[in-house]
């Protein structure tokens, strides 16, 4: 296929640039038509930047990838979908807001667009979605990270080592908005934000983000584990997250939200 895939991006940070690098190395030509940022004059890197969603959509992207956080997703996603453009959100945790999720699904259905949920930092998301049709009774996500990966994004003290949080996926997204997007993906693929259990652990000796997914039900059970290296010291995201966003933008390896 020689026609370039036209991709827009919300955000222009470490994650966005890492994903753009993966897209640039694909066999199919990909054109990054622009990044939506608050101040184009301060944007770093070689990607073209725009200061409004109208300017970005004027570049006729076929798909837009959000890499700018939950607030940006809430602000721009509905307009993107209403324009008939598919959306790949990195900030899946924002979809714990039932009203927002409903509004985005309504906009997508009306315009014939899709919300492509990436697999993020975890393997086994497709298996969890398949198991849901058979019957899933319990889902647990357990994340183990170095203190800096969690402390910079929350207010209040955290333990030096051990269990920092235990609760539902909905509670985890509220507590760790920068770190709990994977829990959103797991909740949407499986049994929802309230029934999905989450444990966040701190390990000062950790050199990677360790993600574990455990599920049990009428299908049987499984345990998946990923030890993901971070993109950089300044980013909490694992390198594989950028790859999953690129894969979803290219049209495969994603969960279609419905």
Swiss-Prot record:
It comes from the Bacteria. GO terms for biological process: NAD biosynthetic process. Pathway: Cofactor biosynthesis; NAD(+) biosynthesis; iminoaspartate from L-aspartate (dehydrogenase route): step 1/1. NAD(+) binds at residues 121, 181. One of its GO terms (molecular function) is NADP binding. It catalyses: L-aspartate + NADP(+) + H2O = oxaloacetate + NH4(+) + NADPH + H(+); L-aspartate + NAD(+) + H2O = oxaloacetate + NH4(+) + NADH + H(+). Keywords: NAD, NADP, Oxidoreductase, Pyridine nucleotide biosynthesis. Its EC number is 1.4.1.21. The active site is at residue 211. The iminoaspartate product is unstable in aqueous solution and can decompose to oxaloacetate and ammonia. NCBIfam families: PRK13303.1-3 (NF009828), PRK13303.1-4 (NF009829). Belongs to the L-aspartate dehydrogenase family. HAMAP family: NadX (MF_01265). Specifically catalyzes the NAD or NADP-dependent dehydrogenation of L-aspartate to iminoaspartate. PANTHER family: ASPARTATE DEHYDROGENASE DOMAIN-CONTAINING PROTEIN (PTHR31873:SF6), L-ASPARTATE DEHYDROGENASE-RELATED (PTHR31873). This is L-aspartate dehydrogenase 1. It comes from Bordetella parapertussis (strain 12822 / ATCC BAA-587 / NCTC 13253). The lineage of its organism: Bacteria, Pseudomonadati, Pseudomonadota, Betaproteobacteria, Burkholderiales. The gene is nadX1.
